[in-house]
Regions:
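PRPP-associated nucleotide enzymes
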Residues: 1-137
Length: 137
C-alpha cells in the first residue's frame, strides 16, 4: 500500500502489510490443520473484513465456502450504542457447519460476542473468530 499520499495524517505504521500477510498465512495453515476433514464456512463481517477475508482465503490450500454479514452496534457516531442490528444477513444456511468469523478490527467485542451467539442459535456446529487487529483501550 502506498502511504506517501497520506502526508502527515499517519504518525507511524504499527503493523506492516508484510507482517499482516505473514500472520494470515500462518493462521491459514493453522485453520487448515484444525478443520481438516471438517465442513467449514468463512463468514466475513462487512465492510471492514473484505480485504482480510480475501487475503486470508488466498492463503488456504483448499476450497472453503464464504458468506457475508453486515452488523452494527454503532449509531450515527463512533461510540457503540450497545444494540446490535443485522444490516445484511447470510445467504446460506449454517446448520451443522463450523463457522469461522473473519473480522478486521476487534474493538469492544460486543458485536462479535453477539454474532457468535446468533450463529450458534442458528445451529452452527461451532463458531470461532479470526480478527486481524485488536484495539487496546
Amino acid at each position: 500500500m502506498d502511504l506517501s499520499n497520506l502526508g502527515n495524517d499517519i504518525e507511524r505504521v504499527v503493523v506492516s502489510e508484510e507482517q499482516i500477510q505473514t500472520r494470515l498465512k500462518e493462521l491459514a495453515k493453522q485453520v487448515e490443520k484444525d478443520y481438516e476433514g471438517k465442513d467449514l464456512v468463512l463468514v466475513g463481517v462487512l465492510k471492514g473484513a473484505v480485504m482480510a477475508m480475501a487475503d486470508f482465503s488466498r492463503h488456504l490450500q483448499r476450497h472453503i465456502d464464504m458468506d457475508w454479514m453486515a452488523v452494527s452496534s454503532y449509531g450515527a457516531g463512533t461510540k457503540s450504542s450497545g444494540v446490535v442490528r443485522i444490516l445484511k444477513d447470510l445467504d446460506n444456511d449454517i446448520l451443522g457447519r463450523n463457522v469461522l468469523i473473519i473480522e478486521d478490527i476487534l474493538d469492544t467485542g460486543l458485536t462479535l460476542s453477539w454474532l457468535t451467539e446468533n450463529l450458534l442459535s442458528r445451529g452452527a456446529k461451532s463458531v470461532a473468530v479470526l480478527t486481524v487487529l485488536r484495539l487496546l483501550s
